[in-house]
């Protein structure tokens, strides 16, 4: 305590415990946060099937002070260097100790499945349009979250792997992670890392949003529609209002909300 005293003026923020408990605290904290993420994603997937809006559900449960709004944003699952590693480490530690951590294992399994959700929506959409082979996807976002270039365990990698294996080409842009992406994916024959936000859309068949960068939140929808061959947006971060997107002529798909499409009725 004396060693840390100059750096810990608020005594309530410093807790002294044994080494094993300290290690367990670190793992448990990250697993708790990961659990909240997997939980809201599980709820989002149920919402889609029963006609509920996960955004409304999130606001409702978050209003309960015992739950709060932190870490209950539906999307593409967690990634990066901490949550995946610590969740897996606690699962392994538990099993090595003779205990089956069913809940934590489910958190990991749900997260892995969530990274495939957007890719499946894209595959389903094009299934009735001749399939994915020869199609081009514009991808916004490569990092596992905004404000970093970290692509470890990023959902973008799972989407790229799945769709390119089915014959789709991917043109991607990320404001920060471009250089890292070139090192990871530069030799991939079906992947091109672009230099600017709208470059991937030129001649693409659809747009997918994977990372919630601020610059993706208010794009030029008219420009997007003009550049895309098919006006389809797959929003893995729920950045846009579904009715607004449909009103501008887009087929719009998000997480935990009903798909939206422009009216096909002819005006009189």
Map each language-model feature to its residues.
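Structural/interface elements that position substrates and couple domains in central-metabolism enzymes
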Residues: 1-268
């Amino acid at each position: 305590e004396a060693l840390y005293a100059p750096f810990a003026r608020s005594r309530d923020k410093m807790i002294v415990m044994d080494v094993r408990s300290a290690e367990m605290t670190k793992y448990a904290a990250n697993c708790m946060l990961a659990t909240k993420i997997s939980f809201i994603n599980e709820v989002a997937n149920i919402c889609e099937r029963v006609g509920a809006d996960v955004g409304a559900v999130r606001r409702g449960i978050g209003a309960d002070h015992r739950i709060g709004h932190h870490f209950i944003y539906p999307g593409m699952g967690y990634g990066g260097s901490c949550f995946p590693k610590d969740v897996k480490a606690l699962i392994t530690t538990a099993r090595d100790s003779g205990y089956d951590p069913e809940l934590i294992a489910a958190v990991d399994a749900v997260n892995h499945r969530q990274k495939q959700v957007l890719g499946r929506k894209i595959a389903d959409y094009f299934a009735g349009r001749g399939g994915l082979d020869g199609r081009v996807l514009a991808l916004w976002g490569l990092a596992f979250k905004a404000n970093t270039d970290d692509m470890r365990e990023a959902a973008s990698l799972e989407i790229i792997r799945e769709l390119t294996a089915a014959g789709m080409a991917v043109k991607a842009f990320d404001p920060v992670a471009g250089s890292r992406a070139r090192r990871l994916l530069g030799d991939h024959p079906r992947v091109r890392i672009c230099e600017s936000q709208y470059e991937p859309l030129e001649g693409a068949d659809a747009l997918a949003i994977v990372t919630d960068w601020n610059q993706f939140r208010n794009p030029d929808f008219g420009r997007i529609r003009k550049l895309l061959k098919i006006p389809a947006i797959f929003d893995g971060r729920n950045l846009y209002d579904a009715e607004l997107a449909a009103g501008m002529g887009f087929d719009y798909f998000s997480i935990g909300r009903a798909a939206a499409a422009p009216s096909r009725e002819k005006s009189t």
